[in-house]
C-alpha cells in the first residue's frame, strides 16, 4: 500500500463519520416527531425505545469508524517510515 492510498482512505473514513453523524441527527429528529405525534402511551414508549436503539447503533458505527481511522493513521506512519528507509 502507498502513502497516497492511506491518505485517500482517511478522507473517505472521515466523510463516512460525517455522514453517520448526519444520519443519527436525522433519525433523532424523525423519532422525536413520531414520539410527539404518537396517540397511545404504548406507541410513545415503543418509539422512545426505537430512538434509543437507533442512536446507539449510530454511536457504535461512529466508534468503529474512529477505530478504523486510528488503524489507518498507524499504517500511514509505518508506510512513511518504510518509505524513508528505501
Label every PLM stretch briefly.
Residues 8, 12, 19, 29, ...:
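Charged/polar, solvent-exposed surface patches and flexible loops
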Residues 1-25, 57-60:
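Short, charge/polar-rich alpha-helical segments
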Residues 2, 6-9, 61-86:
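Long amphipathic alpha-helical coiled-coil segments
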Amino acid at each position: 500500500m502507498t502513502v497516497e492510498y492511506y491518505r485517500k482512505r482517511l478522507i473517505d473514513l472521515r466523510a463516512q463519520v460525517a455522514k453517520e453523524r448526519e444520519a443519527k441527527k436525522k433519525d433523532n429528529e424523525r423519532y422525536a416527531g413520531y414520539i410527539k405525534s404518537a396517540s397511545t402511551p404504548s406507541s410513545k414508549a415503543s418509539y422512545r425505545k426505537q430512538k434509543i436503539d437507533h442512536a446507539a447503533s449510530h454511536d457504535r458505527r461512529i466508534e468503529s469508524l474512529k477505530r478504523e481511522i486510528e488503524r489507518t493513521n498507524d499504517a500511514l506512519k509505518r508506510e512513511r517510515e518504510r518509505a524513508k528507509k528505501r
